[in-house]
Amino acid sequence: MVMSASSFSGFPADAHILGLDIGSISVDMVLLDGLGTPLYSRYVRHHGQPDKVLCAELEALERTHAGIAAAVTGTGADRVARLLGACAVNEVIAQVAAASFRYPQARSVIDIGGQDSKYIQL
């Protein structure tokens, strides 16, 4: 599924939607409002302790933003999604959706991660 402005039509404007990427090197996150506008983003190297970093980051977010819905991708996505009651999303699908939503004119995505690299032609 590729996201568009209408993808957010089911959310109230004051909703909080969190995208998490649990990678082999870092925990990356972006918090969007119900219109898809970024409210917060963070990149944190986890030094082999992704759960510890994720817990600290989520606790900080919960102090300032209530009612967060989450989707998780990356190396640890399935396990973290189960723990949080969130949905796990394949990382290529997440990258295509994000690039298409934020940069509709984009024709490709290059992802250089800690574990692998990918070229995606849109």
Predicted regions and their residues:
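A short, basic/flexible loop-to-alpha-helix module at the beginning of a structural domain
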Residues: V2-P12
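Short helix-loop-beta connector
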Residues: F11-D14, H65-A66, Y103-A106
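Short glycine-rich, Thr/Ser-proximal phosphate-binding strand/loop in the N-terminal lobe
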Residues: D14-K52, A56-E59
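A short acidic Gly-Thr/Ser loop motif
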Residues: D21-I25, T75, I112-D116
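Short beta-strand-loop/turn "lid" adjacent to the catalytic site in phosphate-handling enzymes
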Residues: G34-L35, Y43-H46, L61-I93, Y119-Q121
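Glycine-rich phosphate-binding loop of actin/hexokinase-like ATP-binding domains
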Residues: R42-Y43, N90-L122
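Alpha-helical scaffold segments in soluble metabolic enzymes
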Residues: V53-A56, A60, R79, A98-F101
